């Protein structure tokens, strides 16, 4: 996800909004930005404010939600970012998702690209958080089991009737950037469209181990070069 975002802002075609919709949020670490609050935390704050009656007088719940939403929007030089985070108390994400959906509706026209990093369950896309998905990237490691897991996600996307403009598979961390015959056979077995293959990259691995943002690696990095070619081939 971080590398894709890096490629988009590097092209300078317009502003990018990043939505980290994975409950185990860490995309900000890949991008090298600090997260002070998440929409999950805001949900808890709003619930407590409503319970204790501390929503400012003269301010509706919707106004308060919009104000708090602004607190969660991270504005970086290269992109803006929202983190869904996790809810700590009981209850569901329904209201937070509603806030996210309504606020995104207001913010979307300001961005050329919106990139959402999802959990495998695709809950936020299924709930209509985004009005339409132009490109769905399915990411798997270079293993048969990884491809099988992605194939199940592809089935879910079809069952949900999401109909993205284009959808395809990117294989990550392939030794020497090459597919094993067994993995290729598994891809063909499930009828998955292969967008491309990314090589195992020692520099990316070191960034992960050392806690450094891999998106800041030089443009000559092998994984960045490979991803740039894939994105050009699919019109991004």
PLM regions and their residue ranges:
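Glycine-rich phosphate-binding P-loop
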Residues: 1-2
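C-terminal boundary of histidine-terminating zinc-finger modules
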Residues: 210-221
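Residues in the short beta-alpha loop(s) of Rossmann-like NAD(P)-binding domains
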Residues: 21-24, 173-175, 201
């Amino acid at each position: 996800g971080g590398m894709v975002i890096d490629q988009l802002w590097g092209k300078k075609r317009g502003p990018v909004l990043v939505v980290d919709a994975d409950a185990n949020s860490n995309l900000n670490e890949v991008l090298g930005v600090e997260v002070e609050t998440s929409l999950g935390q805001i949900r808890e704050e709003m619930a407590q404010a409503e319970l204790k009656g501390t929503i400012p007088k003269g301010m509706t719940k919707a106004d308060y939600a919009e104000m708090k939403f602004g607190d969660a929007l991270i504005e970086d030089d290269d992109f803006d970012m929202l983190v869904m985070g996790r809810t700590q108390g009981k209850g569901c994400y329904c209201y937070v998702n509603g806030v996210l959906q309504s606020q995104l509706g207001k913010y979307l026209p300001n961005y050329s690209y919106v990139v959402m990093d999802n959990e495998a369950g695709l809950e936020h896309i299924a709930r209509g958080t985004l009005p339409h998905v132009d490109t769905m990237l399915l990411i798997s490691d270079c293993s048969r089991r990884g491809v099988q897991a992605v194939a199940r996600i592809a089935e879910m996307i079809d069952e949900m009737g999401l109909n993205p403009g284009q959808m395809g598979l990117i294989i990550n961390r392939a030794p020497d950037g090459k597919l094993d015959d067994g993995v290729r056979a598994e891809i063909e077995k499930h009828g998955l469209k292969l967008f491309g293959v990314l090589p195992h990259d020692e520099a990316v691995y070191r960034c992960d181990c050392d806690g450094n943002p891999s998106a800041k690696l030089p443009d000559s990095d092998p994984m960045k070069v490979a991803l740039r070619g894939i994105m050009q081939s699919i019109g991004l």
